[in-house]
Each structure stands twice: as C-alpha cells, then as structure tokens.
UniProtKB/Swiss-Prot annotation:
Binding sites annotated in the UniProt record for ATP: 359-366
Top EC class of this enzyme: hydrolase
Upper taxonomic lineage: Bacteria, Bacillati, Bacillota, Clostridia, Eubacteriales
UniProt protein name: Lon protease
Family in the record: Belongs to the peptidase S16 family.
Keyword field: ATP-binding, Cytoplasm, Hydrolase, Nucleotide-binding, Protease, Serine protease, Stress response
UniProt record, GO biological process: cellular response to heat; protein quality control for misfolded or incompletely synthesized proteins
SUPFAM superfamilies: P-loop containing nucleoside triphosphate hydrolases (SSF52540), PUA domain-like (SSF88697), Ribosomal protein S5 domain 2-like (SSF54211)
Cellular component annotations (GO), alphabetically ordered: cytoplasm
Gene: lon
Amino acid sequence: MAEEEKIRQTIQELPLLPLRGIIVFPYMVMHLDVGRERSVNAIEEAMAQDRIIFLATQKEAQTDQPGAEDIYQIGVIAEIKQLLKLPGGTIRVLVEGLARAEILEYIDMEPLIRVRVREHIEPDVKSNAVEALMRSLINQFEQYVKISKKIPPETFVSVVAVEDPGRLTDTISSHLTLKTQDKQRILEALDVTERLEILTEILAREMEILELERKINVRVRKQMEKTQKEYYLREQIKAIQKELGEKEDRQAEGEDLRNKIAKAKLPKEVEEKALREVERLEKMPPMVAEATVVRNYLDWLLALPWAKQTKDRLDIDKAEAILNEDHFGLDKVKERIIEYLAIRKLAQKMKGPIICFVGPPGVGKTSLARSIARALERKFVRLSLGGVRDEAEIRGHRRTYVGAMPGRLIQGLRTAGSKNPVFLLDEIDKMSMDFRGDPASALLEVLDPEQNSTFSDHFIEVPFDLSKVLFITTANGMHNIPRPLLDRMEVIYIPGYTEEEKTRIALDHLVPKQLKEHGLKKEQVQISENTVRRLIREYTREAGVRNLEREIASLCRKSARAIVKNPERRLSISAGNLPSYLGIPRFRYGLAEAESQVGVATGLAWTETGGDTLAIEVAHMPGKGNLALTGKLGDVMKESAQASLTYVRSRARELGIADNFHQNTDIHIHVPEGAIPKDGPSAGITIATALTSALSRRPVRREVAMTGEITLRGRVLPVGGIKEKMLAANRAGCTTVILPAENKKDLEEVPANVKKKLRFVLVEHMDQVIREALLEPVPVQAPEPPETIPAAIETSVPVYQGMLEETPPGLQT
C-alpha cells in the first residue's frame, strides 16, 4: 500500500512549456522569454496554482505549434521564481529546475498543453566506481575551463563543492556550450553512473576539439608573415565588398567626391583643401581609421553653406508690421532693426551688426530675436551659452582627437543651410571658464566685424565668412560680460514693462495663446482687463511677463477642468472672483509702507530682474557709539552708510538732533530680506533720511521713495537705472520720487503713463531731501536719558518741539 502511494506522488498533471533550442537541467536557474499563446496560457495556469510547470525541449526549434511527436519525452519539472510582463504580450520568467520527469500522456493540447508526467527520484549512489568517475569528470572540467577561457574560475570552485554525483553532472552540463542533442542525451540518462560516463565522453571530445583549435591558431600565426596577412585581409575585404554589392574600385568614391566639390561652389582655398583630402583618401587602405576621419571631414566641408544665403525682406513696412505683431512696445529694438533694413536697401554689401539685448528675464529677448529672423525672412539659429566652459564648444576640436566635431557655430550654420542666418547667442553673461579654456575669448573673433569674415574652426581648418550673419546676443546684466567682448557689441537695453504694457501684452498675446494651447475658445472663457490688472498687481511682481503667463496658464487649466465636467458652462473670470482660482494674493499692491513710520525710509534699487523698492530700517538705543549694518550688504553700501552717518553727525544741530548723540547711542541699520545680497551707492540719501528720522523722531512720508548717492558734504550725486526704479516706484504705489537733479535727463526714458502717476522732486542737496521726506516729530515719552546728556534735552517732546520751531539754517529755502 505504501509503495502504491509513493508511485502516485511521483505522477503529476502539469502545464507544459515547450522550449526551443534550450535544455534546462535540475538545479539550473534560467530566464525564459515566452510569447506563444499556448505557452503564455501554460505560464498563467502554473502561476494560478503552485507555480510548478513542466519544461521539455522541441525536437525542431522552427516548429511553431508543436505536437506530441515534436517534443522530447524527458524534461524537467521546474518552479517559476519570477514573472515579468513585457511590451507586446511577451512574458519573461525566471525558472529553476527541480527534477527530471517523463511524459506519460498528453491530456490537453488547447488552449495549452497539459501532460501527465512521472517524476524521476534520484537514488543515492555511492561506490568506488562512481567516485572515480566524479574525480575524472572534475579534472576534465578543470582543464576545459583553463583551455576555453569562457567560464570564470569562480564557477569551477562552486562545481568542486558539489558532492552529489547526479547534481554534479547537471551543474557541469549547464555550463557547457553543447549541441541540443548532446544536452538532451545527458538529460535522458536517468542512471547516474551512465550519466557520468556520457558527460565524461562528451567533455573529452570537446577538450580535444579545443586543443586542436588552439594548435591550429598557433601554427597559423607563426606561418603568416606580415605581407601574407595584409594580402589575406585585403582578399577578405574584397570578397565581403563583392558579396555586399559594393564597388571594388576606390576611384569611384573619389570621382563622386570630386563631382560634389565641383557642384558645391566652394571658395578657391576650400576647394583646394577638399581636393587634397580626396587624394589622401584614395591612397589610404579602405578600412583604416584615418579614412573614416577624412570622409567625415569632407562631409562637413560639403555640407556647409559656403555660397548659399537667403534674400532679405527689404520691405520696411512689412517687416515693421511683423515686429509689431509679435511684440508690444520695445520701440528702440524695432527702430534699430528697421534702420538696418534701410541701410541694407541702400548698401548691399553691409556687414551684419552685432547686437546685444540686455534686460531682465521675461521681457522677450529670445522671442524678439526669432521675430527679427521672421521679419527679415532669414533662417534662425539659437545657441545657448549658459554654463558653457569649453573653448572647443565655440571653435571645435582638432581632427586628431577621437570623435572630433566642429564647434557649435559651424554646426548651427550647417543646420540653417544659409550663410546669413539670424544667429542668437543666448545668455552670453552666463559663460564661465576652466582648464579647458575661455569660451568668451573665443567669441572675440566671432563677434568682431573686422575679423569674423575669416573665422577659422579648429575642425574645418579653413576660413569661413561669418560677416553676413546677423549676430544677436542676450544677457540679464553687463557686469559678467568681459569688457573686450562687450566693446564689440551694440548694447540695446530692454527695460521692464509698465503695467499698461503688461496689460496690453496679456490681452493681445498671452491670453489668446494660452486659450489656444489649452484647447479653449474665447467664448468659453472670458478674462477681463480688470482681471489682468489684478493679476499684475497682486499675483506677480516682475519686470517681464513670464510669471504673468504662468498665472494665465493656471487660470486656463482650472477653466478647462470646469468645462470638461460641464461642456455647456461659460466662465467669466473677473477681478472679484480671481482668488477663487489662484488663491489669496501673493503681493500687496499699494504703498511700499502701510503708514508713515519713524526710522523707515523707502529706497529704490536696480537688479537684473528690473527695479524694486528697498526698505531701510534704523533703530537706536543707549550704548557706546557703535554702528551695526545688517542685511547682507556689500562694501560699497556699507561705506555709503558710514558716509550717511558722518553727514548726520556733522549736521546734528541743524537736523534737530543732540550734538553728542553718537557718544552714548548705538545705531543699527538694517535692510530687510537679509538673504539677498545688496550693494551700490544709490541708497545713500535713503539711509541718511532713515537715520535723521530715527534720531529726530520725525516720521518718513509713506508715499515717498528716493534714490541718490550722498557725499560727506550732503551733495546728492546721480545714479543709474532710473527708468527701472521709476517703474518699481509706480508698482509699489508711491506717488512722490526724490532723485538727483542730474538725473533729470533720464526721465525722458520713463513711459508717459508712469510719469503722469508720479511727482518727481529733483534735489541737489540732502537738506532738500529732509524737507521733502520728513513729517513733524512724533510726540512720545522718551526713555530715561544717560547722565551725560544735557538737562536741556532730557524730555523729548518739549525739546523737539522747541528745536523745530526755529527753522534750522540748512533747511531755509
């Protein structure tokens, strides 16, 4: 009864996976890719049960739908360890062989092959004969590993550790590269002793073949001399070329290249160079590495637009209409391009100008260059220089380097297919240098109209005329551009947009663009002018319109979501319901300060992103006359604060401040947003005003903003960035701006609609600033003064009032 139960346990019904050209042995782990329908079904059934499957090899690998007669009877019961579904319906499985088994009968053939198999249980065989066979097999396998050099030594170490004879044969067989029939023969040997003998015989035969191969290779290497070797290789190449249908005669390639050179209309110097390279190519053996380099070089020479150029659109009215269609405002830039067209119409051989657009991010520098190319009907090429450190990016690599290529200028011209494109060098101020060279120095030749007609790339090695190219560069600021490079360019500054300009840009360009990109129609979403104005005032604070466009895109996304839910819905986004779409406002529109305060003055600053307001805070307390400066200030700004304090000390009596205040008072000057570096002299009068306010208890008028450099004598010197600062003052809601009298000429650049909203106070001396900016003192109870302060000023209110009733001589008009 026990014997019958044992037999039943070894007989199983399992799904069958037919293998093509692969034999899996017990204890062997292997990846299999399964794609046939019946095979996939077999895998899925095995996974649904206990992951056990039967693996048997087909007699012919080409058979797609094998039957019972097409599959070997002996196979392996295996366990599926992992399963991964690949694109296309293919399944990749990781299987591990468990035991040999024999097919007793086929139960089903569709939708999968299901068989009844009998598992072969390995007997425990231990005898001297088996031990001798095992030792012989291990020695043979060791020699095989040494001769073949295809099996790592670690594998041999793991094989030696196997003590079971059956497992030893299966492990060695799985590592040998044998024919399918030989491996199947080993698999079908159920007797362990017989299996050892078969594998020993096969391994001995394989070693004999390997030894013969080694001897043949050694003998052939010794017999072949250099000339015979070259002849043999040449004959092989000829035979391969003949089989591939290639021409045996290399003169045909040379003739083809000469014809291309003749048609390319190359300059004389370039044509001579190209013909010399063709002659070199014809003399070279066909498969040497240098031949590939020469072919690549000739391909580049012939692909460049030596004589190809587009015809400029010289219709000034049409070009102006295109520029106005793409961009609102930017009159200076448009005027410069129209001037260029006018001169081109009069002087045909004019060299291309080299223009540098400098301005904050988001004002349209890059898109303007693309619009200029469209207006001129020229090709457009853009090269981003941000982060470029290698000179070879500009000049290319010499041909001696592996994988050498021309610089990105030459590559751009090849892409354009024209010798006179509009070539944009974007972010020219973001270049840097390292041990590979300085790309800015390489650009000196490119951006010099007197030199770029003979620009020489390291790879091309012949001059290329860049004088027809209209180079446009862009930068956020000029301080990072090397002075020699800046000297070669015509700088056109593009300032930030006013609120009116932003409104028009949004309504005429950004809103229609975003509606189209989000698949919305104008009738579905209405965005009013007041909505755009609130967007500008309370959700963005920038010189350009990049963030404004992002906010409009956010409105479109939320609108699209609502319309998808209800296609009949029509949305009207007004200034009132804007927070329901974008959340609470991010910025406070209005006065820079909510109320007039003591010791707080509003200055104006210039940054690469446009103008901005700058609050200066001053506090004083009993101490020893120390001055503290915080807010990440630069050296120039620190010196400006020292000069302001010196001015206030020298004018203390006239300003209503105790003469000896500095002896017993510590002063702290702070500029908020301490993580942002700040520098420059233009905050001088603002610091002096805040100091005077704090020490005299006179509040600074909240609607006043100011800019100007101060001297020790109180003179107010001119500063830069006036237009940007006025735009910032207008954005902040200030109504009065104090600025140096010498900056009056710069007000011409301020847009008219901004000038209408601001009152400008032109000053030459600090006394005028104090008179305009400060209010009457705030009557507060002063703290108990130190003993050294004179009794006449121990109480703050009466003393301040008394001192201010008499008009100081410095404040007289």
